[in-house]
């Protein structure tokens, strides 16, 4: 049983690493200026070929939920929902230690995505001058 608990903590650590990687790539796409170094980033809609036409990175911003679906209650609800969902997923991941690893990995990936979107909505509006706290666009 202890081994499963270690796995849950390992999965949370992997989720943390995925969130860091997700945010680093988003900052690289959006651009930044730090300590005299400026990286211009990509233009909205710009696409970069990674492996020919098979794999391309395209800069898009999502104002809503999955697939751009808008929600009537506004950004503050989506931001809080992302936070609450992330907390719930952490709790659930720690509680289902006996579940199959595939289920736990799927939950870990959903957690990383939900928390990454929370960070986007929370801070990107302020950092990039697009809106107040809680009103940033999700960079996809």
Regions found by a protein language model. Give the residues of each.
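Alpha-helical transmembrane bundles and membrane-interface segments of multipass inner-membrane proteins
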Residues: 1-140
